[in-house]
Amino acid sequence: MLPARLRLLLLMLLAVGATDTLAQKAAIPSAVPPQQQQHTVQGIQQPVTPIPPLTEEDRAAAFPDLGGHPTHDKKVFSFVLFDQLEWRTGGETETVNWDMTGWIGGDVHRLWFRTEGETDEKRLHEGEAQLLYGRAFSRWWDFVAGVRQDIRPDPARTWAAIGIQGLAPQFFEVRATAYVGASWQTQARFEAEYEMLITNRLILQPRVEFNLSGKSDPERSIGSGLTSAEEGLRLRYEFRREFAPYVGISWNQKFGGTADFARAGGEATRATRFIVGIRAWF
């Protein structure tokens, strides 16, 4: 047997030879082209097939000319609201009342239509229609001007109308309109309402309306000054936003010379009425 020292020396020589062989193999370049290697030294995966350079045709295909972007600033819209379509009871007679507003146009210029009135099973007591041009002069307010035609009571009257309408602070919807008729007869009307959301669908709507006249009109039993006022509360439930039945109550009162004309004709000067109706828009 070989001495222990000789065996140790042979083992060391074999180890050194193996190390040199591995180093030589590592120094020999790989036969696989770099672009076909699957991973870099850091371990990042590389594509097997090289990526061709980006051309102008590639850019044009990725970003085609889409033309102008469509806008809606010139589009014509329309809206119709039956704010009141109701049956009233509790006064001298049972009546059906309506109050409808509609418009057609854009964000700034609109053509407005308003109509309201009262009828019973026998005849039309009150009825009027207004055609107005409206122009927005701020984000929340419109200027309106046009014509109003009174159908009832007799005799019929035609008025020039001018006013403003919009959303006041605290979200009160307001309409204030002045009217000028024949022989410089003047009238004015102020309306305001507010929507209180009890829930997202149950809404309480207080509303007030005041009417004034510049001078007496005996033919229509209207005195000068404050002629009449109406306050009301309506509670509606919106099954859909476009359709909501409601119940409510209203208080009507006549003042001054208008009240005198009513008393002379045997009519009451104030009344409390209960209301059932439908509010709808489209």
Regions found by a protein language model. Give the residues of each.
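Detector for outer-membrane/organellar transmembrane beta-barrel domains
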Residues: R157-P218
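Outer-membrane beta-barrel initiation region
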Residues: L2, L22-R123, G127, G134-R135, ...
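Outer-membrane beta-barrel "beta-signal"
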Residues: L233-E238, A268-F282
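Residues that define the transmembrane beta-barrel architecture of outer-membrane proteins
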Residues: V76-S78, E94-W98, H125-A129, A156-A160, ...
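Transmembrane beta-barrel strands of outer-membrane/channel proteins
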Residues: Q84, F113-G117, A145-Q149, A176-V180, ...
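Residue-level signature of outer-membrane beta-barrel architecture
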Residues: I104-G106, R135, G166, V180, ...
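Repeated loop/turn-to-beta-strand initiation elements of outer-membrane beta-barrel proteins
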Residues: V108-W112, R139-F143, Q170-V174, T199-L204, ...
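Extracellular loop and loop/strand-boundary signature of outer-membrane beta-barrel proteins
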Residues: E116-T119, R148-D150, A161, A176-A178, ...
